[in-house]
Amino acid sequence: MMLCMDMPRDLLHERFSGETLNPLLQWMNPPSLWRIDQACSCLLMEPDRETDFWQETHYGFRADNGHFLFAETRGDCTATTAIHCYPSHQYDQAGLMARFSAECWIKTSSEFEPNGPSHLGAVVTNRGFSDWSFQEFPYEQFQSGGGMAYCLRLRREGRDFLVEHAPAEAGPWNLMRVARLVSDPEQLCQIGLYACSPKGSGCRVEAKFLRIQAPWASPQ
């Protein structure tokens, strides 16, 4: 049988339907309030106030206390999630992150603006300096009970990362950012879900799943 080299393989597929998290997952700075809701098969979390990931640029501060639920991977991979975020304060955010260190990482998420329009954004941090890009949130907000619903995909290809967004897991997927992280392509990478509330508390996040995939390896 011929092996399809383009078919991805699951490194992790957490549907948040069990009593505990997949043992491959671990927290960096867990929020005070989080739990698995088996009734809706999602991870619920409420980011603590004054939490963020940012390094120096323009604003002159460093923050590395955001909430990050990750698995460790090596080599090329793709992380995908579906998020429903109920924000309360400006810059409330939830999405995906890939991280090598406090000074080398990428994150992508919704970014709430109470006076609108809200954003989908990406922050790329190299050598301790962050670079922020964003676009207007392209999907309907505050419909059917409120919140912002969206899917995100973060692909690692060597040193390069591609950020994509979609209204649903089936797509269509839209490219939002292509960036390089100054890191060893063989270095262990932490990749997974993150959430922050840089100002006040009250934001609620539902993560429907976290899937991390890698390309099929050549048979030996």
Language-model features and meaning:
Residues M2-Q220:
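Extracellular glycan-recognition regions
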